[in-house]
Amino acid sequence: MLGSWQKNWLEQQLKATQNQRWNLIGQQVMVAPLLQPDLREVVDPNGNSVFVKSHSREAYQKAIDASKYNLPLLLDAWDGYPEAREDFLQLLKRHHNNNIVLTGDIHTGICADLYLEDDEQPVALELITPAVTSPGLDDYFPTNPQQQAGKAFIQQNPHIHYIEGTLKGWLEVNLTQQQMRAQWNYVSTVKQPNYQVSQGYSITRQANEAV
């Protein structure tokens, strides 16, 4: 995930900003672990999954069946590179107290604490913006009743505070010297020029609070 040149560059940047109140890291793919729950218990195998549209009903069923092993969902994210993730989080812990990681890619609104493997205190807070138009987690794993996949993932991953895998929108992050506040916002439709905006989950952290 990080070559030696990139890792050295990042450490130099972290050292140079040690006196800043907040440390924001913008990067592409999910850092927090995302282990699969046993989706056989919650997913509708006959649901209108976008996985079926891009692959096949048979492949979708195999993916659901494989979830019983509780493997990471995203092996092309940091979950596929656990040693690199540990190195990255060690850098953050070494140089900053107020670490906020901003992420996209998964098309799902997520808020999660980031831990080193043997630590009880989180190193950073990860904020993942929802999709603008692309399908999210619940669109891949439809349930009956709806939107139960996200809840199942939270139960399997206690470091995750929030998952919204259907609605489309954006994430706002406001920083002051005293606190950080993140607000997930959603639109009622992406198919029409007129829409309503609603507020979803929000989280506030104080500066120098264990995150």
Region annotations inferred by a language model:
Residues M1-V211:
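Metal-dependent phosphoester/phosphodiester hydrolase catalytic core
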